[in-house]
Amino acid sequence: MNKRSLFHFSSRLHGIVLATLSLLTACSFFSGPKTASVSQIKVVAEINANQSSATQLDVVFVYDATAAALLPKTGPEWFDKKAALLAGAADSIDVASLQVPPATIADVRLPGRHSKATGVYVFANYLSPSGQAVSNITPYKSVTIWLTPSGITYKFP
């Protein structure tokens, strides 16, 4: 192979590599929003959880940014506005609802399209203010929600 042929071969190979990289970049750019990793959620309620009361718990799966922006910042606010939010969100939100008594272990039944969710949030109607904040569990694959006497903790095994 002479120098000129080698130069053309090298230029052509360089062009092919650049075109391939451009296509790969475009595919990842146009693939849409990143989806949630959540595939398993377990709830463990300790004996005296939520002042020995059953805990109303909603795991909210959101499918677009507009619906995510409408979510309240606390559990009590979520439960107060839940009906209106669901009516206005149409197909943008799925909810897995549980009523968890103390001394209980429960698996959360995930909605059929959970793998397409762009966000997953936990709302609890806890008596103590320390258990009322919304929790974003979107990036975690496996989540255990611990309901304790004083609040809620999350474990990501």
Regions found by a protein language model. Name each.
Residues 25-26:
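C-terminal motif of bacterial Sec signal peptides marking the signal peptidase cleavage site
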